[in-house]
């Protein structure tokens, strides 16, 4: 698959070079991919211990993360304790959410977040019923979570977060416009 992308990117770069004196070309990803080697069947275990989804709590089961909402703080504590006993993942603590950029002022993203370890999936989940060979969306500290930035030039900015890609594109485009004016 990489050869297919390389061929098309080189073709695109060639088209740009046909119409411009200077082309600064870069490609970026927003995350890496991890090989999947196992799955956990989390939904029936949570429902066995805490009742059906939608009664005392609301849960959304993504392939790598489970999010929980409840107005019952003691239930959230019980969920956190139960999930904290699992070796296949961990709960994201409140103080860590700011570092990850997920400390939202509202509850739209959940009250409690459980993320599975790299290489595992929650199967079934609301994202699918079967295990896949690769996945993203693990904790940013995961070995294969890093994104990449490839280009034919040295960037003026060193992006360390996906939010910085826009700043890099804006600075590069602005500099090229100024140089050509």
Regions found by a protein language model. Give the residues of each.
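Short acidic-hydrophobic sequence patches enriched in Asp/Glu that either
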Residues: 1-4, 38, 60, 75
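Generic hydrophobic, helix-prone segments enriched in Leu/Val/Ile
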Residues: 14, 18-19, 46-47, 75, ...
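Acidic/histidine-rich catalytic neighborhood
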Residues: 18, 22-25, 29-71
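Active-site neighborhoods of enzymes that stabilize oxyanions during catalysis
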Residues: 55-177
